[in-house]
Amino acid sequence: VPGIEPSIKFPIHFGTSGFRGRWGVEYTEPVVRTITQAICDYLLEDGLAGKIVVIGYDSREYADIAAEWCTDVVLGNGFAVHLTSRDTPTPALAFYAGEVLAERSAGVINCTSSHNPVEWHGIKFSLRDGSISPPRVTDFISERSTAYQRSELTHAPTKQDPGHPEMVDPREPYCQWLLDSGETDCRISLDHNRMRSYFADKLVIVDEMHGTGRGYLRTILDIIGVPFQVIHAERDPRLGGLRAANPEEPHIQLLKETVAKTGAVLGLGLDTDADRYGIVDRGGSYIEPNAVLAMLTRYLGVERGLTGCVATTYVTTHILERIAADIENNDSFRPAPGSLPMHRRDPDYKVVRGAPDGMVTRNVFTVLTGLKYIIQVPQMARDYTLLDDPPPDWRCRLLIGGEQASGLTSKGHVPDKDGIWASLLVLDMVAYFGTSLQEIWRETQSLYGGSITAPINLTVPDKHKAPFIDSYLDAGRDGRLAGMAVVFAGGIPGKYAELMLEDENGNTDNFLHIRPSGTEPLIRVYLETSSELAMNALRAKIDEDAAAI
């Protein structure tokens, strides 16, 4: 196997989704063992010695080998290991640790780089309940890993008889757990009979993208009785030639074409580790995650009358604010009046125009990008203050949480992204309304106001990222951008910027957010406008600025 020669020493950044690197370049055996030892150090310092570490991996080439390296280190540190017998979805690992092992669990190590291109690999750590690691944990792992790198302590102390891992496959219990959702707990229930009846004479296409989700939706749809057809159904360590197994445009062309060609009413896509979803409506129309989140919030909160916090990242559609205002008996799950989101309280946050209270949401909790921040919301007071001792049922305080990048979880569910569960919620919603997603979205916009959203990914050299972001803060100071007046501009210099703009008609429902990707060599720009004219003007400005680099 290539890539196991000694690696070049470099600081290790272990972020929201762990560590990611290219096989044989940044991602090598010494690096994986070093990070795993740092994780073990954290677990030992947290008093979890001797408990079970769940180790899984995704379907890409060599990921299973990386999982074996992790297993060696974890066993050498005296922990028991439950190693998955096949590539396994991230949410299924979270379920297994939090629901099956429960108090016996120490945490989850997952060898995945999620939706990234095939040459990229990753290692991610989740807490013993399946939660995404918060910053205090990822910072510890980063600092300890880098310290090991500098001192060349890259291997674990080995026990005399470390033992062997127990092989597990959580697919069957996880699928049954989803089917039983809401029957005996606070989770959201699915109406199997209505789904079976509505889809009886219809077809659903499932795009497994050669990933870990193979067989999961198939099992569940079979049991419910929903007719389906599967594409990209085989495990392919090279992901079938896909540039990235990422269920969004332009990577889901075959799903769009198959839905259109077969006359299917719905297409459901999963990424490599099945934590992201991709939705295609009849005729082959891709549905943006922002629209999916808005429709599900309407369905669950307004139509079904379920209550709980609605949590989203600050780059998600503002139509959510208007929908969440319509959820009855939900006042105790709304932000306290006038409370600022945590990212705008950061001492490095600079307001260059306007007042931050002009960007405050009254019905939706807004946080930084990443599910790890979304799952903090039900662990907060209404003023965004993190509780030292969250209530035991904190997961039940969330109604729905999601982000523009196809990540979603809901009331009582695993505290991580789950593309399989998101797909089932969409199926349940479509059966409830009895029509296409495009029609549901048109009706939602007619009720709550229209919005146009566009995510833009720009490849920008590292040395130009901070100046590029700061140029939009400068535009905020100047007071105009793309022919529109800047009402508000703020952010952390070099890290991100957010702007609210007023068009010539006096409409201020126009927003620009810009930040570097935490996992890819990209700058992400998110636009939301009230008109095509404003959208076209902003896109032209972004294109012009990118071309000038």
Give the role of each language-model region.
Residues 1-72, 76-77, 163-204:
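An N-terminal, well-structured beta->alpha segment
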Residues 17, 55, 93, 109, ...:
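Buried hydrophobic positions in well-ordered alpha/beta secondary-structure cores of metabolic enzymes
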Residues 120, 265-266, 306-549:
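Phosphate-binding and adjacent anionic-ligand microenvironments
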Residues 2-9, 121-259:
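Gly/Ser/Thr-enriched, mixed-charge loops and adjacent short helices
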Residues 49, 54-120, 219-279, 346:
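N-terminal small/polar loop signature for handling phosphorylated ligands or for N-terminal nucleophile
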Residues 81-91, 286-289, 312-313, 365-369:
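Active-site nucleophile and cofactor-binding loops and adjacent substrate-binding regions
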Residues 12-25, 113-114, 208-212, 216, ...:
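Conserved phosphate/anionic-ligand binding catalytic regions in large, soluble enzymes, centered on
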